[in-house]
């Protein structure tokens, strides 16, 4: 059962995001990107207050670099749609289980990203989650 509302167009949009942001990280990496996106929708805190739809979350200004590149606009594949559905249905995996941010640095992961603590690295991406004081909803929305 979905933890956020999603149409088939939303599933396709999410699938395209997963591929464009993390195809090189494999299925696990794409699921982690999906976790961050769904967390942003569910948390309603920090930079993500007021997001209500997958479309809003993906096209939020400066949220995902992938939307500025042509690869994002290519058709989603069935395998990517399946991963998107798993994220939409609430499958959460460490280190993105409570993360709201990730990025791909040139070198080591900084201990903090915009004052939010580092959780772990998965392949090339560093994941960061808010403190409970900053965003308690991310810890109790599922």
From Swiss-Prot:
Keyword line: Cell wall biogenesis/degradation, Germination, Hydrolase, Secreted, Sporulation
An annotated Gene Ontology molecular function: hydrolase activity
Localization per Swiss-Prot or TrEMBL: Secreted
UniProt key word Aminoacyl-tRNA synthetase: no
Gene induction: Expression is sigma E-dependent.
Taxonomy, superkingdom: Bacteria
Single GO biological process annotation from the record: sporulation resulting in formation of a cellular spore
Modes of activity regulation: Activated, directly or indirectly, by endogenous spore dipicolinic acid released in response to nutrients. Is also activated by exogenous Ca(2+)-dipicolinic acid.
Signal sequence annotation: none
Keyword Secreted: yes
Family annotation (Gene3D superfamilies): Cell wall hydrolase SleB, domain 1
Pfam short name (any one): Hydrolase_2
One GO term describing the cellular component: extracellular region
Family: Belongs to the CwlJ family.
Function: Probable spore cortex-lytic enzyme involved in the depolymerization of cortex peptidoglycan during germination.
Name of the protein in question: Cell wall hydrolase CwlJ
